[in-house]
Amino acid sequence: MANIEKTEFHVPAPVSAAGNQKSSLGNADVDARLQSNEGEVETSLRPRSLDEFIGQPKVRDQLNLVLSGAKSRGVAPDHVLLSGPPGLGKTTMAMIIAYELGTSLRMTSGPALERAGDLAAMLSNLMEGDVLFIDEIHRMARPAEEMLYMAMEDFRIDVIVGKGPGATSIPLELAPFTLVGATTRSGMLTGPLRDRFGFTAQMEFYEVEDLTKVVVRAAAVLGVSIDHDAAVEIASRSRGTPRIANRLLRRVRDFAEVNADGHINLAAAQAALVVFDVDEMGLDRLDRAVLEALIKGHGGGPVGINTLALAVGEEPSTVEEVCEPYLVRAGMVTRTGRGRVATATAWRHLGLEPPEGIIGSL
């Protein structure tokens, strides 16, 4: 195994705007192009079929049965609800469903559907067998959600024409379609909406073994040479999340191209992850800030989510949906009726001795 302490790497200083390298692009143009390139790379890393999809074996097998049965009957599959933390493959799975069915995919998000008319316009443009993907479906406005009930059940909607006493309702038949909804907050879905999904699946965090396969596959797609132990190292720091694994791989690739002739070995991976502030547990700056606010600022808790978010300068939803699921899974934070509490594991991770009686202390 490579010894990182014996390997020296050079981290280049950033080039200032006043430096010798000039560009005809403005900062906004550069940012837009970089974001576009990152998006294209992310898309290229997505598996296209169920056979290519790594991990989530139960969801994959169940969904294969649902899709195969529908195709054999020549009908649109039941509507699908995918729930779970961000980055586990919900959007990718929606793309795969459309691919497996050989149909078109239309994509939108809950916050974008503010009015019933917004949804009606999208539904009326669907062709038979199309897949409609609504991300963050729990954030749909109520009028749009109520229109969706009838669309999901009867493949029709009532369009209101006019206002006041003279308003009339015109029924509009829809082509049979499959709705795929994704949510990170399944508890916020209303009962009537949840009940209209014929198949629901909970996406789980990935084990290191499956994440290693994700990293190896992504490296092959990107044309990056990587050692197996380096792939394991990246996977073990990816918080059980493929999206994070792919992102870390790209950052390690950048580091290796500057410092290791483009080849990623264990030492290069470890050094790169230190540079990008990802520790051995996969915690980043925000995760550690949450733990420090909880432990150093409030004695380990309990602390309410709003207070915790204020302490780290983030929205409560960010702390609750991005940081908390992994911190809970890693055994560092527990949720109680009075608020969040840091465990002994969290204290020790910050190099502190946990008080007696704390959860997980000896």
UniProtKB/Swiss-Prot annotation:
DNA binds at residues 335, 340. One of its GO terms (biological process) is DNA repair. GO terms for molecular function: ATP binding; ATP hydrolysis activity; four-way junction DNA binding; four-way junction helicase activity. Residues 280-362 are annotated as: Head domain (RuvB-H). The keyword DNA damage applies. One of its GO terms (cellular component) is cytoplasm. Mg(2+) binds at residue 91. The keyword Nucleus does not apply. Transmembrane segments: none annotated. Residues 13-206 are annotated as: Large ATPase domain (RuvB-L). InterPro entries: AAA+_ATPase, AAA_lid_4, DNA_helicase_Holl-junc_RuvB, P-loop_NTPase, RuvB-like_N, RuvB_C, WH-like_DNA-bd_sf, WH_DNA-bd_sf. It catalyses: ATP + H2O = ADP + phosphate + H(+). ATP binds at residues 45-46, 87, 90-92, 153-155, 196, 206, 243. Residues 207-277 are annotated as: Small ATPAse domain (RuvB-S). It is found in: Cytoplasm. It is an enzyme of class 3 (hydrolase). Residues 1-27 are annotated as: Disordered. Its EC number is 3.6.4.-. Keywords: ATP-binding, Cytoplasm, DNA damage, DNA recombination, DNA repair, DNA-binding, Hydrolase, Nucleotide-binding. Homohexamer. Forms an RuvA(8)-RuvB(12)-Holliday junction (HJ) complex. HJ DNA is sandwiched between 2 RuvA tetramers; dsDNA enters through RuvA and exits via RuvB. An RuvB hexamer assembles on each DNA strand where it exits the tetramer. Each RuvB hexamer is contacted by two RuvA subunits (via domain III) on 2 adjacent RuvB subunits; this complex drives branch migration. In the full resolvosome a probable DNA-RuvA(4)-RuvB(12)-RuvC(2) complex forms which resolves the HJ. The RuvA-RuvB-RuvC complex processes Holliday junction (HJ) DNA during genetic recombination and DNA repair, while the RuvA-RuvB complex plays an important role in the rescue of blocked DNA replication forks via replication fork reversal (RFR). RuvA specifically binds to HJ cruciform DNA, conferring on it an open structure. The RuvB hexamer acts as an ATP-dependent pump, pulling dsDNA into and through the RuvAB complex. RuvB forms 2 homohexamers on either side of HJ DNA bound by 1 or 2 RuvA tetramers; 4 subunits per hexamer contact DNA at a time. Belongs to the RuvB family. Has 3 domains, the large (RuvB-L) and small ATPase (RuvB-S) domains and the C-terminal head (RuvB-H) domain. The head domain binds DNA, while the ATPase domains jointly bind ATP, ADP or are empty depending on the state of the subunit in the translocation cycle. During a single DNA translocation step the structure of each domain remains the same, but their relative positions change. This is Holliday junction branch migration complex subunit RuvB.
